[in-house]
């Protein structure tokens, strides 16, 4: 028993010496199929080259178009992006964008329920609110038809 405690203590000390654990690296632009960013006060969308040559292009364009509209309605691109600081705000901005994307995907033949659930999980992950994924799935079902 003493040997086990010594091993656990040594492992704990090693973990502390290694520094804080990181679950994942910081997201980069190339991690996303499309990104809307600000350029001289205007919302500008960039879609990855591999997506522009695929069937996903229309879905991603629909999604990012919502973000451009949100930025314009918010009173400016920088102000809109600066407002995305909480899980609630991220969910509020992503839900209509994924809804637009879902409509295009379903029109192309994607399974409605499975795609809706997949997008709800993505919103949950992006917002850092995985514990709310069932609520987000319900909202997606109720608000996106």
Kindly label every feature range from the protein language model.
Residues 6-17:
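Bacterial N-terminal signal peptides
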Residues 19-23:
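Sec/Tat signal peptide C-region and signal peptidase I cleavage site
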Residues 90, 102-145:
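Long, well-structured alpha-helical subdomains associated
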Residues 45-60:
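Short pre-active-site segment immediately N-terminal to the catalytic Zn-binding motif
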Residues 55, 71-101:
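Post-HEXXH active-site segment of zinc metalloproteases
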Residues 24-32:
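Cleaved targeting-peptide boundary
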Residues 59-72:
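Active-site recognition of the HExxH zinc-binding catalytic motif
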């Amino acid at each position: 028993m003493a040997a086990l405690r010594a091993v656990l203590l040594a492992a704990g000390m090693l973990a502390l010496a290694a520094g804080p654990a990181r679950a994942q690296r910081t997201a980069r632009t190339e991690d996303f199929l499309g990104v809307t960013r600000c350029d001289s006060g205007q919302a500008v969308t960039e879609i990855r080259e591999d997506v522009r040559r695929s069937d996903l292009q229309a879905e991603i364009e629909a999604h990012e178009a919502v973000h451009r509209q949100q930025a314009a309605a918010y009173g400016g691109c920088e102000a809109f992006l600066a407002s995305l600081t909480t899980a609630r705000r991220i969910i509020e901005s992503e839900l209509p964008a994924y809804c637009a994307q879902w409509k295009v995907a379903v029109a192309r033949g994607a399974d409605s329920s499975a795609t809706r659930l997949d997008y709800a999980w993505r919103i949950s992950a992006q917002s850092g609110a995985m514990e709310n994924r069932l609520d987000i799935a319900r909202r997606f079902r109720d608000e996106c038809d």
